[in-house]
Design a protein with these regions (language model features):
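A short, flexible N-terminal coil/short beta segment enriched in small residues
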Residues: 1-19
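Acidic-glycine-rich active-site phosphate/pyrophosphate-binding loop
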Residues: 16-35
Length: 174
């Protein structure tokens, strides 16, 4: 599955949500689909999207918060899984795109998921009540819709190909 295809599949459902992305490919591909004022791109903040999303979810419980994370990023901040599980915000959906490499820094470094580490199992072991791992666009869309309806903290790991955008440039006219 390509990340862009997965993002395109859920893009319409993101309209009413606060969306926090990690740096690089996720941010660029989401922006290319069409910037919205409720999209917050954490450029140059690898590892912090999950923490930022958690803070927003806790402080604004009336909003649905979607974090679009990456395997390298969450591996830099595994403690956020236990903190999310501790507070269990029902309005937080944590999507982790797992391509098994550090794509945004050159793709020359593999992550621990390339050798068997299972991020969905880590989230479940940390206490996240709803976890899933998917590898097709249809399964991703279905799992995302189920997360929206569940009103429960969810970590959704999407296995994707290590392919990035043609350009990482984002202009949000700030």
């Amino acid at each position: 599955m390509l990340r862009r295809d997965a993002l395109e599949a859920i893009y319409p459902e993101l309209a009413p949500c606060v969306v926090v992305t990690i740096m690089g490919a996720v941010a660029a591909e989401l922006h290319d689909l069409g910037h919205r004022p409720n999209f917050f791109y954490l450029e140059h903040a690898m590892g912090l999207a999950s923490s930022m999303g958690l803070g927003i979810a806790l402080s604004r419980p009336e909003l649905t918060v979607v974090v679009l994370d990456g395997d390298g990023s969450i591996l830099m901040n595994l403690g956020s899984l236990t903190t999310m599980a501790r507070y269990q915000p029902p309005n937080l959906i944590h999507v982790v795109f797992d391509n098994e490499v550090l794509l945004s820094v050159g793709q020359s470094f593999t992550t621990a998921t390339a050798t068997g580490s299972d991020l969905a199992a880590m989230a479940a072991a940390a206490g996240v009540p709803r976890t899933a791992k998917v590898d097709t666009v249809d399964d991703f869309r279905d799992a995302f819709h189920a997360a929206l309806k569940s009103k429960a903290l969810t970590t959704l790991v999407a296995k994707i190909e290590p392919e990035g955008p043609a350009s990482y440039f984002i202009d949000v006219h700030m």
